[in-house]
């Protein structure tokens, strides 16, 4: 088991970039966080490893009580953030935009990484357009994978409301059905893609880590409850700093990050997790403009009737890039 002391000591010795990312001077010069107890969502997916790898970094930021709260699904997890029960999360952008459009008080702070989603299909599906009239497995309607695929379909002129049938199953069941040809495609997420490749189930139709335009936009964002951010700006910035440092850790030390995920029960298969972390560009938050990602996805979701708000309204009312811009200057390396 990797202890807190071992984790921080090893990262501090991870080379020049590691030292820069983890140096405490800036954090200690700031006021203490307004709250010392912090709750974050606990959901499946190796790609959001920064949220879990950040645990010890959050403690170093002054949060003495850090806990991860598990809900029934991703939609319920976002509802918990909106209610303030769990004030902070890292999650897929699409569902967050839908919740904001419905009036939930969520604020986007930063894009965390690109990638995550890989669409696997039978030989009858060679492109996204071939999904018309087909059945696709997803784990939950309104989840990140469902909303991402809806966006991808909108990009090629399909209407996910009528051109495809979504079949809701667990990941294991969807993989089985795809292998047996009982569904035509499965929208895989994070380490599931590594398992499907290893088991030689289906073929890749779309990989959001490498295929344009998806590879140009962040998949997962850090979001916060609006009231929490207003009342606790220091805590909000410190939490964001810990997660972005953890994203850098995932880029530089994917093996160690994967080990933390498995040891602490956030993932099961070390090899699948480490393969996922090695493939994802976790340092893109430094250079990408998160507003560009919001514009891109908001247009797609508006086209298929999933949101009513314009990209301009979403950006103006539900984003706050101040902390991100400050951290881009602070965490140079």
Identify the function of each model-found stretch.
Residues 94, 173-263:
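Pocket-lining segment of extracytoplasmic ligand-binding domains
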Residues 58-63, 210-215, 282-290:
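Short, solvent-exposed loop/beta-turn-alpha elements that line the ligand-binding surface or hinge
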Residues 231-309:
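Secondary-structure end/capping motifs
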Residues 302-333:
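Conserved C-terminal helix/tail region of periplasmic/extracytoplasmic solute-binding proteins
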């Amino acid at each position: 088991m990797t202890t807190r002391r071992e984790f921080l000591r090893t990262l501090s010795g991870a080379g020049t970039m590691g030292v820069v990312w983890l140096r405490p001077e800036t954090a200690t010069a700031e006021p203490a966080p307004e709250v010392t107890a912090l709750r974050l969502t606990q959901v499946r997916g190796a790609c959001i490893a920064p949220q879990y790898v950040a645990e010890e970094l959050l403690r170093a930021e002054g949060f003495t009580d850090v806990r991860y709260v598990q809900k029934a699904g991703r939609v319920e997890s976002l509802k918990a953030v909106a209610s303030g029960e769990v004030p902070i999360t890292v999650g897929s952008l699409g569902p967050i935009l839908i919740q904001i459009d419905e009036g939930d008080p969520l604020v986007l702070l930063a894009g965390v990484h690109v990638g995550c989603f890989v669409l696997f299909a039978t030989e009858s599906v060679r492109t996204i357009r071939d999904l018309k009239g087909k059945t696709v497995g997803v784990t939950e309607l309104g989840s990140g994978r469902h909303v991402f695929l809806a966006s991808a379909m909108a990009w090629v002129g399909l209407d996910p409301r009528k051109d495809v049938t979504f079949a809701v199953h667990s990941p294991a069941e969807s993989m089985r059905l795809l292998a047996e040809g009982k569904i035509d495609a499965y929208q895989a997420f994070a380490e599931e893609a590594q398992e499907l490749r290893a088991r030689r189930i289906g073929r890749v139709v779309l990989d959001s880590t490498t295929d344009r335009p998806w590879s140009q936009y962040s998949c997962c964002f850090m979001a916060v409850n609006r009231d929490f951010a207003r009342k606790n700006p220091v805590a909000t910035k410190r939490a964001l700093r810990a997660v972005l440092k953890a994203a850098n850790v995932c880029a530089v030390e994917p093996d160690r990050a994967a080990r933390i995920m498995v040891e602490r029960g956030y993932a099961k298969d070390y090899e699948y997790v480490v393969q996922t972390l090695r493939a994802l560009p976790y340092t893109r938050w430094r250079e990408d403009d998160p507003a560009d990602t919001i514009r891109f996805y908001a247009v797609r979701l508006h086209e298929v009737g999933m949101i009513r708000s314009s990209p301009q309204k979403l950006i103006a009312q539900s984003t706050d890039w101040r902390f991100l811009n400050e951290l881009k200057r602070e965490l140079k390396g």
